[in-house]
Amino acid sequence: MQKYELMFIINPSLQEEERNKLIGEIKAELKSASLKIINEDVWGEKDFAYKIKGSKNGYYIVYKLESERCEFFDLVKSFNLKKDIWRHLFLKIED
């Protein structure tokens, strides 16, 4: 199995209910892409080195994932269309 790490920066001004809904959507998309969530690490709000979308901070979430194979194109396209996901980064973890 191949392992991956995925980090999100989410709009910090979202209410908890909205943020949980967005996180639920992200998890559903990961599952539909045959990615198994091994670990979810919520960092919470952290300051940026520079402003992103006029904000000095963002809400960080990091996932450790594994899968036999993954279609990243559709996931990245979907994440790019969500206005409250400000940044995301997929990394392939070498054993």
Predicted regions span which residues?
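S-adenosyl-L-methionine
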Residues: 63
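Long, contiguous binding/interaction regions
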Residues: 1-58, 66-95
